[in-house]
């Protein structure tokens, strides 16, 4: 449960945590590791089994030396490399010296790089690769007392001492009732002990502290999966995505849930043709833009499938690169792509499609346009944009939209992103 800083978020989430009920280093080893080890090497296999069992029990420090010996014998074992990376990160949490912790975190990431090079692209390896290359770590709190309590809890957890970890996390929460990670980690420990009701209470507590952090939802989803409460688990995994959709790790829980339900996560195939490029300003300060028109849009009138309506989407963007953006965002000095701009363009397309349908000028509506119209009619157009078509500019508009329309984002993910794999 080691704190780390993802490159894409400020959240102080933890990496050293329970084995996932949805898929992990352990399950990967159990499924495929022995295929990769030379047949007849019982000693290697048995020691690998032992390391797995210790890991299952949360005894990371006991598993690490075994993994190190296995690595010395077979440096290319991708699963052993993953286990060593995870174990090394756990060991870092037990160290009181910040410089020593940094060195171990650097080592942990390097081992993850080696694991990936050896062919291991598991979710855990991808997560370990998000560790900062310089080994830096965020603090849990500006309060020295809270920080010390959290570090103590992390060290105890990494050593498999859950009782001491609980005591330290509780102390941190008493000192700071808004300490998200303390509530989160208390739920995590409860989950490991099979205390599901208590785990749920702690995860809910963390969510109440900060509903815009994804981890408590995702951990709670894992806990519900372990209980066989799959429908409720899906709800939590979706809420995790709503909280922080632009982190790779956020989608992990929902993706694994979907896979087990023979479903996939896939955005609607709606890709407007044409493009517009912002070329800055000329000598007089006037905006310069290049509009690229996909000529197939103009020729599509003969198809009578409505695809010529995409023409207005491209044209709508030209005004946004000029005065329209300044009018809508008077406090922003430089142009950026925005949710409002995308909404304007898509709504113009939808309006034109509906007008043509009314006039019976469309014989067979293009599937992408049919989906766009349906999404618009369901009031999910903005959710489609922020989830399926985000960029740096649109991401800036997400918090305000999320705070007002969580239900719409949940609906969009449930009805449009989760699709049957058949």
For each predicted feature, which ranges?
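Eukaryotic alpha-helical solenoid repeat scaffolds
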Residues: 238, 252-422
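Alpha-helical linker/edge segments of TPR/alpha-solenoid repeat scaffolds
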Residues: 90-101, 131-146, 257-283
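Helix-start (N-cap) detector for alpha-helical repeat units in TPR-like alpha-solenoids
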Residues: 44, 78-79, 123, 146, ...
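Canonical tetratricopeptide repeat
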Residues: 83-84, 127-128, 151, 185, ...
